[in-house]
Regions:
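Conserved short alpha-helical segments that host acidic/polar catalytic motifs at enzyme active sites
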Residues: 1-512
């Protein structure tokens, strides 16, 4: 867990982070919890083992895990065991504490005060039972102390407000402590995380909780990680707090920089505390980690899971004439607020009510699903993640590029891309907003504009002032002026770095 920050001043770079993994979800459409969903998700993880990576010790992996909807019966049992009576509004959080326990008291006190300040209460802590024997030497070397925090809130606090307060409390604790070996896997009234650097067939052995007879859920997201050019860390095992991701976000540096550039415009009116928390999106770690941070922030701002995902990972809409004009206006509106987090990427996610999957517009990560007569939906990187009789299958299919699928466990229905798109386009009059408040450059007739005239002497002075070389004038500026395109060429650039150059260089050259 500590590897990444220890290599901060080495040749290792967080930009090496890449993923290519196995993922999936299983949910009961009627929100009926069962141990079958947990057991089958673990079986699915085992069958996706070939999509993950295993260390040479044979026991340490790049990471695998489960993100499950709150197992209410199990949590009441756990709380009762340690003398805690749970009310209607409660939350559990899984926390990777530093291996060195000297700082644990301070960490717990900080959680206590920040949570109390927001009108909630820490009821207690639970040491998560684990079996270290199934860990390899690499996993053991960085094994954190895994604990669960138990939190209560007033009965009249709405669950969405409860989630927001938990989110703010976690961010405040992280900012105050600035402890690199502290990681909150999940802290929610809706979901709980179990993950780590163990091989998939050992996850239920490592976490005995997962085979407890009272451990039942109606929804589970699972993930098997394969990372290249990176060192496995406990906190980078997936699923994260909302999503699990297969692929790469190839635009990650741009996405992070654009977030930093416009972070002051991303304020959430009813969460003023967040103004002091930036950067909320990780500027290092893995691309998936940063994507989860951004999704979490949008959900805290009440965007909803569909709107948030379509903002982050939109389909290819610009040149698609088959798309409804109102839907196109919806996508255009959101494109003005955030650039796509482009893959290839396949993403499974949950907010506790919806379980969903989205493919980016490249569509280079497979996602197939089946719906069975017992009202379970299974979606995964491939078919055959568990055995079933074909006669039990009601519907099956795959996601195409830019598609999104979701199951609503509250209303017991499956929503396909067209259903989700209809919800989005009918939400607001995006076409009217664009017509009234935006201007397209194509509406201007630039030929009617009078060109600026420069005399020769002034033009020469300007070129010297801005450091325009003859090469730039001929090979860059002229093609742009004549053809409206960048000039093409195959020669390398052997120009000395500006700081070492004997010539006066443009200021911009220093930032290339």
């Amino acid at each position: 867990m500590t590897t990444g920050h220890k290599l901060k001043n080495s040749l290792y770079s967080p930009t090496f982070e890449r993923d290519n993994c196995g993922f999936g979800l299983i949910a009961n459409m009627d929100d009926k919890p069962s141990s079958w969903i947990i057991d089958t998700s673990i079986e699915a993880l085992n069958r996706l083992k070939h999509r993950g990576a295993v260390s040479d010790d044979g026991k340490s992996s790049d990471g695998c895990g489960l993100l499950i909807k709150k197992p209410d019966e199990f949590f009441h049992h756990c709380a009762k065991e340690i003398g805690i009576e749970l009310g209607r509004n409660y939350a559990f959080g899984t926390i990777f504490m530093p291996k060195n326990k000297s700082n644990h008291k301070k960490i717990k006190e900080t959680f206590f005060f920040q949570i109390k300040k927001l009108g909630m209460e820490v009821l207690g802590w639970r040491s998560v039972p684990i079996n270290k024997k199934v860990c390899g030497k690499d996993a053991l070397a960085s094994l954190p102390d895994i604990q669960q925090i138990i939190i209560s809130a007033p009965d009249n606090l709405h669950e969405n407000e409860f989630e927001k307060k938990l989110y703010v409390a976690r961010l405040q604790v992280e900012k105050i402590l600035n402890e690199p070996d502290l990681y909150v896997c999940s802290m929610s009234s809706k979901v709980i995380s179990y993950k780590g650097l163990i091989v998939s067939e050992n996850i239920q052995k490592f976490y005995p909780d997962l085979v407890h007879k009272k451990m039942k859920t109606s929804l589970c997201v699972f993930h098997q990680r394969f990372s290249t050019n990176t060192l496995p860390q406990w906190k980078l095992a997936q699923p994260f707090r909302h999503l699990a991701h297969n692929g790469e976000i190839n635009t990650i540096q741009g996405n992070r920089h654009w977030y930093m550039a416009r972070r002051n415009k991303l304020d959430i009116a009813d969460l003023p505390e967040l103004k002091e928390m930036h950067p909320i999106v990780s500027m290092s770690d893995s691309d998936s980690y940063s994507l989860d941070n951004m999704l979490e922030y949008l959900l805290a701002g009440d965007m909803g899971i569909f709107r948030a995902m379509r903002t982050l990972v939109p389909p290819a809409w610009q040149n698609n004439n088959k798309i409804d004009e109102k839907l196109k206006a919806c996508f255009e509106y959101h494109s003005m607020h955030m650039e796509p987090w482009d893959g290839p990427a396949g993403i499974v996610l949950t907010d506790g009510r919806y379980a969903a999957c989205a493919l980016d517009r490249n569509g280079l990560r497979p996602a197939r699903y089946i719906i069975t007569k017992d009202r379970h939906i299974t979606l995964a990187s491939e078919v055959g993640v568990y055995d079933y009789d074909d006669s039990e299958v009601l519907q099956k299919g795959r996601l195409a590029p830019g598609d999104m699928l979701a199951v609503d466990t509250l209303n017991g229905e499956v929503l396909l891309s067209d259903d989700i798109n209809k919800i989005l386009k009918d939400r607001n009059p995006y076409d009217e907003w664009l017509n009234k408040n935006s201007t397209n450059l194509s509406e201007y007739d630039l030929k009617k504009e009078k060109p600026i005239k420069y005399d020769t002497e002034n033009l020469i002075a300007y070129k010297k002032f801005y450091g325009v070389s003859l090469e730039e004038e001929v090979d860059v500026i002229l093609p742009l002026a004549k053809l409206g395109i960048e000039g093409t060429g195959s020669m390398g650039d052997d120009t000395p770095m500006p700081v070492l150059s004997k010539q006066s260089r443009s200021l911009y050259d220093y930032f290339r």
